[in-house]
């Protein structure tokens, strides 16, 4: 099934259909997953991996032939023709990637910037066939080019939340620092005013307050 000319958010049925066509799962496994209760907000690969279905592509003599999230990530990335990338949070310039777009925009578009250089932005996604966001991305990254990579839904959910929380914490700390600096400046101005031997009439009440302090 070719979906490269369409923009779609893949769901559980789409993934199961493709896995069945690719002979990764059988009809029994398909029926088990599709008829079970599930969290519809969860990424379909996470849901499928929880069932531990036999992997039809695993070698016959393999000790572990279960369908894992790691294998499913490789399968979907290959189907989309995207490189599979694993985030190393220590190598990500968090302020740089989060300033490109809001958390809510990144969440709704199923994306996360993970690298920013002088001329390029690397954008990760766990929905490789959803491309609606590409129509507006040039407005966000300005003159830079971009390339898209596939991220595990487990990683993108975790680090999207953590990166933006870090940015909010930094912004909050900077705000507190600026307020403290402003308070110090105001106090210094008052003290200097208190030393003025010929204050303006409008400032005399402030001088009295400073002298009282």
Segments from the language model and where they lie:
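N-terminal, intrinsically disordered, highly charged
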Residues: 1-213
């Amino acid at each position: 099934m070719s979906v490269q000319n369409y923009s779609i958010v893949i769901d559980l049925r789409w993934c199961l259909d493709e896995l069945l066509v690719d002979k990764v799962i059988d009809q029994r496994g398909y029926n088990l997953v599709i008829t079970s209760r599930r969290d519809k907000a969860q990424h379909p690969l996470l849901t499928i991996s929880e069932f531990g279905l036999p992997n039809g592509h695993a070698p016959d003599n393999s000790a572990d032939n279960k369908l894992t999230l790691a294998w499913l990530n490789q399968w979907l990335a290959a189907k989309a023709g995207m490189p599979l990338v694993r985030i190393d949070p220590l190598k990500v310039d968090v302020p740089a990637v989060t300033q490109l777009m809001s958390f809510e925009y990144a969440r709704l578009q199923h994306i996360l910037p993970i690298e920013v250089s002088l001329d390029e932005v690397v954008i990760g996604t766990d929905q490789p066939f959803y491309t609606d966001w590409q129509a507006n991305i040039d407005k966000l990254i300005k003159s830079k080019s971009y390339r898209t990579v596939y991220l595990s839904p487990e990683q993108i959910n975790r680090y999207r939340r953590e990166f933006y929380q870090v940015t909010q914490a930094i912004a909050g700390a900077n705000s507190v620092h600026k307020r403290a600096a402003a308070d110090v400046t105001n106090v210094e101005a008052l003290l200097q005013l208190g030393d003025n031997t010929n204050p303006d009439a409008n400032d005399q009440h402030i001088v009295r307050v400073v002298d009282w302090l």
